[in-house]
């Protein structure tokens, strides 16, 4: 039994593997030529962009491909946050959020450290979201406890207060509805290799209306090559260098599968399996940490000391 899908989905659908192999055999570099292999690469990349835009309620040009969610989060954070800025985060954030903020010298304000009730979580954000907050960074689902945060209400609060929001959808993309348009977020970051069934080395940054990400890398984009500056339009501004075309082709196949299956159906199955697992673990004497707003993640501890458990 594989217990680590929260980190990486191990058994990729065969459609994903076939798409990767096909791209490796048939695709060159997009935007670097007009020959058949270059055009095949451009088509593969654009198809994935269109599928991601459709699933996450965005426009294709708002889809920036990254290496993973960490890459996407770093780009988003460094776009909005400067040294000394106060940034409001939840108590469930991953190091992909905490470490970039620390490296930037930002002051992090935590909206409660262990709030598993959606109303309490929203209240904590409302109390701490004052005029001195430069940005809010919030995970949609905790990668440790599987707690689903009330991201829609947090997003509405941010819009009301005029504070930009960065959403970490690492644990929710492909399992819960994620809409860039409805959330009105500045940025939404997600990996390709978890709930979207793509290969490792793939990720997506959704860029909200009017948002232009600060590039982490500068280089060739296949556009306005005579300029020494990175393009000032999406998605080129965030995509320096040759893209991971085989990975993106595999991600495209994963997105197609998620779209065909439906995130609601995927969530029902995962939640049912998680509940079944939690009951079994409790019957075996384990301490299980679950709540009413639960995803497919189950955290548990043996109900004895480590030596006895071993």
What are these regions (language model features)?
Residues 1-310:
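Pyridoxal 5′-phosphate
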């Amino acid at each position: 039994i594989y217990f680590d899908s929260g980190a990486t989905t191990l058994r990729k659908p065969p459609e994903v593997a076939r798409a990767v192999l096909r791209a490796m055999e048939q695709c060159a570099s997009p935007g670097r030529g007009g020959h058949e292999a270059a055009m095949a690469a451009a088509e593969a990349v654009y198809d994935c962009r269109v599928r991601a835009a459709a699933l996450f309620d965005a426009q294709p040009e708002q889809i920036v491909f990254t290496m993973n969610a960490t890459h996407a989060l770093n780009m988003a954070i460094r776009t909005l946050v400067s040294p000394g800025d106060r940034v409001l985060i939840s108590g469930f954030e991953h190091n992909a959020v905490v470490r970039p903020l620390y490296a930037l010298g930002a002051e992090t304000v935590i909206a409660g450290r262990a709030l598993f009730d959606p109303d309490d979580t929203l209240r904590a954000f409302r109390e701490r979201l004052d005029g001195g907050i430069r940005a809010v960074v919030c995970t949609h689902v905790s990668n440790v406890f599987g707690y689903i945060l009330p991201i829609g209400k947090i997003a509405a609060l941010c819009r009301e207060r005029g504070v930009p929001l960065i959403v970490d959808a690492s644990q929710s993309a492909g399992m819960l509805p994620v809409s860039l348009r409805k959330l009105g977020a500045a940025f939404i970051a997600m990996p390709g290799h978890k709930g979207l069934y793509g290969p490792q080395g793939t990720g997506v940054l959704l860029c909200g209306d009017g948002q232009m990400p600060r590039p982490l890398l500068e280089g060739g984009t296949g556009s306005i090559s005579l300029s020494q500056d990175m393009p000032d339009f999406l998605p080129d501004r965030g995509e320096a260098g040759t893209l991971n075309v085989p990975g993106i082709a595999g991600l495209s196949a994963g997105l197609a599968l998620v779209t065909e299956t439906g995130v609601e159906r995927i969530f029902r199955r995962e939640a049912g399996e998680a509940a079944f697992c939690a009951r079994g673990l409790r019957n075996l004497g384990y301490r299980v940490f679950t709540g009413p707003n639960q995803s497919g993640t189950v955290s548990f501890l043996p109900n004895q000391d480590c030596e006895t458990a071993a």
